[in-house]
């Protein structure tokens, strides 16, 4: 009988989405097909230190208690000032890596570059696709230049902050409009602007998270999402889902992970022609941005059939509340099958291009 594939599940990380990453990893551990895969959990602490965590310890309470660190096997230590490569053979003997670190350094191409240097197959987009989709400015430019509709926006760097005037953007975009850091996920650092005070507060917040921000118009359309699965040449799409907010605000981090202050409708109530158009555009977006493995394409539906691309997430959440998983479940692919497909796609890409 063929031995199981050893999967390195990389979680945690230094980003603001550390806890979400842990929840995703725990959920993956629960549903991955253990007949086919042996999982080795590689946890990156908030300080950037790497540890191997025993599978039995994979629960949130374990990571909250710092006294549990002694139970973990150190692999690569940075916070102490030493760069110690102990137990590195445990990494090199892995068959494939499943990175589930959300946000900065995890889905922006940084971790993907490290894995490429180590010559390891890994789930999800490559360095280029990850970096593109993490930068809202670059994503929008590429989609716009490819003829797709995007939300009107302007980009600014930190040194330009003092020249930014509320009235200029109120005239340009109308009210309200959004201020966003270019490189954060889960709506972190995003603010809706209605007046001069909220504008300057939004600038402070956005520039705290990034040296580059975008200011964009607020689209009063239906908020829809479509999941994509596959490698660049043959992706498939899920049914569409809709996020219906219970208030007039945008879909915040708390809505997604804390308060659940929105209604999710899957499949979204759409005319068949509109649904097909959205799914076709999602595939085109996936290919234009050089995505591999998976992505979630977020769009606005304006009027009957005007589709505007909002954002693309190359490493969506894998928790019980995650839209990506719910979309595939409604399409007929359960999480266990989805995880297996993602791992096989990673191996297929690796052996095809290496």
Swiss-Prot record:
Compartments reported by the entry: Cytoplasm
Chain ranges passing through the membrane: none
Catalytic activity: 2 D-alanine + ATP = D-alanyl-D-alanine + ADP + phosphate + H(+)
A GO biological process held by the record: regulation of cell shape
Pfam families in the cross-refs: Dala_Dala_lig_C, Dala_Dala_lig_N
DNA repair among keywords: no
Cofactor(s) needed for function: Mg(2+); Mn(2+)
Record: residues binding Mg(2+) 1: 298, 311
Function: Cell wall formation.
Official protein name in the record: D-alanine--D-alanine ligase
Organism: Blochmanniella floridana
Gene: ddl
């Amino acid at each position: 009988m063929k031995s199981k594939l050893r999967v390195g599940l990389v979680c945690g990380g230094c980003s603001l989405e550390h806890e979400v990453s842990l929840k995703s990893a725990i959920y993956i551990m629960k549903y991955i097909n253990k007949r086919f895969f042996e999982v080795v959990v590689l946890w990156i602490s908030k300080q950037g230190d790497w540890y191997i965590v025993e599978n039995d310890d994979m629960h949130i309470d374990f990571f909250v208690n710092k006294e549990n660190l002694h139970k973990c096997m150190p692999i690569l230590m940075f916070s102490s000032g030493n760069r110690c490569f102990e137990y590195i053979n445990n990494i090199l003997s892995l068959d494939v890596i499943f990175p589930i670190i959300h946000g900065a350094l995890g889905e922006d191409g940084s971790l993907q570059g490290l894995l490429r240097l180590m010559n390891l197959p890994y789930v999800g987009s490559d360095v280029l696709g990850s970096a593109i989709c993490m930068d809202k400015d670059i994503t929008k430019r590429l989609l716009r230049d490819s003829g797709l509709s995007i939300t009107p926006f302007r980009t600014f760097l930190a040194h330009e902050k003092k020249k930014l005037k509320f009235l200029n953007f109120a005239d340009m975009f109308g009210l309200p409009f959004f201020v966003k850091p270019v490189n954060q996920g889960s709506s972190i650092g995003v603010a809706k602007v209605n007046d001069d005070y909220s504008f300057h507060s939004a600038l402070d917040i956005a520039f705290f998270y990034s040296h580059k921000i975008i200011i964009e118009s607020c689209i009063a359309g239906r908020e829809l999402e479509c999941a994509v699965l596959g490698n660049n040449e043959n992706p498939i799409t899920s049914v569409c889902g809709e996020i219906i907010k219970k208030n007039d605000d945008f879909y915040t981090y708390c809505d997604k992970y804390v308060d659940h202050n929105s209604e999710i409708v899957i499949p979204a109530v759409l005319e068949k022609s509109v649904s097909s158009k959205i799914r076709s555009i999602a595939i085109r977006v996936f290919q234009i941005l050089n995505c591999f493995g998976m992505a979630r394409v977020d769009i606005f539906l304006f009027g009957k059939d005007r589709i505007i691309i909002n954002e693309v997430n190359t490493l969506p959440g894998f928790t019980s509340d995650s839209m990506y998983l719910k979309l595939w479940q409604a399409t007929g692919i359960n999480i266990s099958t989805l995880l297996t497909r993602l791992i096989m796609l990673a191996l297929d890409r690796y052996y095809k291009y290496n």
